[in-house]
Regions:
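Extended, helix-rich architectural segments
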Residues: 1-109
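A short, surface-exposed helix-loop junction/capping segment
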Residues: 63-65, 260-262, 309-311
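Generic solvent-exposed, charged/amphipathic alpha-helical segments
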Residues: 67, 281-285, 326, 330
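Extended, regular secondary-structure scaffolds
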Residues: 87, 93-193
């Protein structure tokens, strides 16, 4: 997946929505309301998948040793982060490494800076994995990039002053890792490598715009201009202007039968805006397949059958996730 698309998804999760950059003419209300739907969808989907830690079944000393090693390595925490990454970006990336005591450990890498290259044939076997990141000097100033390339036998380290230079340089170091296979593993969210937020991102943006505009309209209504017609308003005997009289006395005296006053404001569209808000909210949950758990239909008196029906979409979504997560765990 393209890096700009992944960055857009990351921004949505971190509430850096496009609405925050919207500009309006000076003097006009310009509220920016960003809603955390992306974070909600990702966290609910990930927790539903691995909220209860993955269990490994087996008998014998080998199985017990494996479970102890996983516990010491905090694998359940890594699994949760990988599930969150997969729900957001469409894939999570795990690296297996040896710590200072030569014990195997694992960590989740940023999918924006790590990936696996596969064979271009029916086997689609992993050929190597890449993890790149900027490097800084002692003063903290960026001075180039470093890339670690993981093959089935060793870890190669490349450094260059520019990102493009990584493609042309020679490895600065080569260290065997002894895992016997590529120790970089991708956890796909589905066969399309698509996240749960992408399909509803435009709906979330529209929801942000709608709610921001509703607050803007409400503020403009409070500050609406008062139009007075058919009457001549003058300074009173205390030297107050018509505007000062209205502000202080809260009263308009219009003796002429043809005179009148009214506020200049948009026609009321509150009902239409609320209907649109509810439609957007419904579509966000419908197409992400993550239900609104604060919905009154999830009240405590709901029947088991009704609850199962409400969670049907999330159950189906989780089955797909589980299939691909299980396959990555076997690596």
């Amino acid at each position: 997946r393209r890096t700009p698309e992944l960055r857009r998804l990351r921004d949505a999760y971190q509430l850096r929505a496009p609405i925050l950059q919207r500009w309006r003419s000076e003097g006009l209300p310009n509220h920016h309301l960003a809603h955390g739907y992306a974070r909600y969808i990702v966290n609910i989907a990930a927790a539903y998948l691995v909220g209860a830690a993955v269990t490994y079944q087996g008998e014998g000393d080998g199985a017990d040793a494996l479970r102890r090693a996983y516990k010491n390595a905090n694998v359940s925490g890594v699994d949760m982060e990988l599930a969150r990454q997969a729900a957001l970006y469409g894939r999570g990336v795990e690296v297996i490494y040896s710590d200072a005591q030569a014990q195997p450990r694992s960590a989740a890498l940023d999918p924006l800076s790590a990936f696996v290259v596969y064979a271009d044939d029916v086997s689609a076997d992993p050929l190597f994995g890449v993890h790149f990141h900027p490097i800084t000097n002692e003063s903290g100033t960026p001075c180039g990039y470093e890339a670690e390339v993981y093959t089935a036998a060793e870890r190669l380290t490349y450094r260059a002053a520019s990102f493009s230079g990584l493609l042309l340089g020679q490895p600065k170091a080569s260290v065997p890792h002894y895992f016997g296979r590529v120790p970089l593993i991708e956890y796909w969210n589905n066969d399309e490598e698509a996240g749960d937020v992408g399909p509803v991102l435009s709906l979330i943006d529209a929801y942000d715009v709608l709610e921001s505009d509703r607050v803007n309209d409400q503020e403009q209504l409070v500050d609406a201009l008062l139009l007075v017609y058919g009457a001549r308003m003058e300074t009173d005997d205390r030297g107050r202007t018509p505007a000062q009289q209205l502000r202080q006395d809260k009263l308009l005296y219009l003796p002429d039968r043809e005179a009148g006053a009214q506020y200049l404001a948009k026609p009321g569209t509150g009902a239409d805006a609320e209907a649109l808000r509810l439609a957007l909210e419904k579509d966000i949950h419908k197409f992400s397949m993550v239900p609104d758990l604060s919905d009154e239909q999830f009240a405590g008196n709901i029947s088991g059958v009704a609850m199962r029906y409400k969670l049907l979409g999330l159950e189906q979504l989780t089955r797909v996730k589980e299939r691909w997560f299980r396959e990555a765990l076997r690596e």
